[in-house]
């Protein structure tokens, strides 16, 4: 009898996910990409494009998740409230013109507003040797930091991570299996919260780089519900020569549409 119940529950799960049209949100946005999801309770991978989920690209600002862990663990900053002084200038050709972030800024605000200049300054203090040590220990990306002239190898150069690797990293982060202290985990989990309701907590980070003639956009994170956790990584890629005003918004719109179809989000 127990076996029948388990099989019935698995059938319901498979049927529910099978009814989800994972390609529809991409068609509606008119853009190519993929969403990779891991159902923690059922140990089930869900792909909109499994082949794409294995292809590594620059992580862009999604790297701020592991970057925040590293700067805290190494003591480069004390906590999320430590303020980094504004450096006075930034390369607007590389990073765009964003006057709203040109001021002294805490780590918490820098994460929320994705202020790249803050993390560039912190990266200079960490150095690539220490980065490589943590990246290897965390199994994060290809650990190739060559090809970037500046400190932000996560936006420019050869460094790359696949959507599936993003998800496995987030799962290890959630389980606190990585080489960081409990305090460091708690701080980063706090600053990652983007939405909290009575039913779920959403922790996530966006990313967008314009390197190599392409726009590469990300949204990665996880949704904690009372009975399960769902990890996700959505990546969109388009030629820079092909305009799409919805590119930035579609990172979130596509992901949320899929998660709503799966009844993960309200």
Question: For each of these PLM feature ranges, what is it?
Answer:
Residues 16-53, 58:
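Beta-lactamase-like hydrolase cores
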Residues 1-21:
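Bacterial Sec-dependent N-terminal signal peptides
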Residues 99-106, 121-170:
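Mid-domain, small-residue-enriched loop/turn segments at the edges of structured enzyme/sensor domains
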Residues 20-25, 29, 124-129, 174-266:
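Structured C-terminal helix/loop/strand segments within mature extracytoplasmic catalytic/sensor domains
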Residues 57-83, 110, 166, 232:
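Active-site SXXK
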Residues 49-54, 103-105, 112-119, 146-154, ...:
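Flexible glycine/proline-enriched surface loops and loop-helix/loop-strand junctions
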Residues 82-99, 126, 152:
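Acidic helix-start/capping segments at beta-turn-to-alpha-helix junctions
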Residues 73-90, 180-185:
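Short, well-structured active-site flanking segments
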């Amino acid at each position: 009898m127990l076996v029948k119940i388990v099989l019935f529950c698995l059938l319901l799960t498979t049927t529910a996910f099978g009814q989800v049209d994972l390609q529809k949100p991409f068609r509606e946005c008119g853009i190519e990409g993929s969403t990779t999801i891991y159902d923690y309770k059922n140990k089930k991978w869900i792909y909109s494009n499994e082949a794409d989920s294995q292809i590594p690209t620059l992580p862009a600002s999604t790297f701020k998740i592991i970057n925040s862990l590293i700067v805290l663990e190494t003591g480069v900053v004390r906590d999320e409230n430590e303020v980094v002084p504004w450096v006075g200038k930034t390369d607007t050709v590389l990073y765009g013109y964003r006057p709203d972030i040109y001021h002294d800024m805490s780590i918490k605000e820098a994460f929320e507003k994705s202020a790249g200049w803050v993390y560039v300054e912190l990266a200079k203090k960490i150095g690539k040797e220490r980065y490589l040590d943590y990246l290897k220990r965390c199994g994060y990306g290809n650990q190739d930091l060559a090809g970037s002239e500046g400190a932000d190898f996560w936006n420019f150069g050869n460094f790359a991570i696949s959507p599936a690797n993003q998800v496995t990293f987030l799962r290890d982060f959630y389980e606190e299996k990585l080489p960081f202290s409990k305090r460091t985990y708690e701080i980063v989990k706090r600053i990652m919260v983007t939405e909290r309701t009575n039913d779920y907590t959403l922790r996530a980070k966006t990313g967008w780089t314009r390197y190599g003639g392409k726009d590469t956009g990300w949204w990665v994170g996880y949704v904690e519900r009372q009975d399960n956790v769902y990890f996700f990584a959505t990546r969109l890629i388009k030629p820079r020569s092909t305009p799409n005003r919805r590119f930035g918004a579609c990172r979130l719109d596509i992901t949320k549409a899929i998660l709503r179809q799966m009844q993960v989000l309200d």
